[in-house]
Amino acid sequence: MQDTAARVLSCETMAQDLVRIILSAPDIAAQAKAGQFIHILVPDSGHVLRRPISLMAADAAAGTLTLAIQPKGAGTQTLCACKPGETIRVLGPLGTGFDGKGAQCIYFVGGGVGVAPICCAMDAFATAESRAFFGFRTAAHAYGMTQAPCAVTAVSDDGSASARW
């Protein structure tokens, strides 16, 4: 576990009500496993507690962490307003992580912002036989399908994302 200053590489809208932040944090990326999370200190003096954020991806070779954050409250709204080049304090990796090594076929199931850690698990453990099933509020809220290493079926509450991607 490391407590480090991570540099924001990008911060952009990924889907409706969802922001993708890519951080440069080589020490954490080198240790991170699918299913783990980090604690982020909101970069202002008004927030004392760190925010737990699941890893959407951890690239040890590039030294990067990819996060999907829903800007709901003041803390996550501040995080989602970060600009490339800024630094934020990050503690991690935390949690036990997933263990899917050796599995022949895994069914991945997630919805909304909870798809982010599933994307990390798919990158680590998906096989040709694996399948993913995602649920979203609407098709505009959907993400995580275009680069999935296995077949993905996505559905939405309003029926606008009821197709195989």
What is the predicted role of each segment?
Residues 2-84:
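Ferredoxin-reductase
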Residues 74-165:
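FNR/FR-type flavoprotein reductase catalytic core
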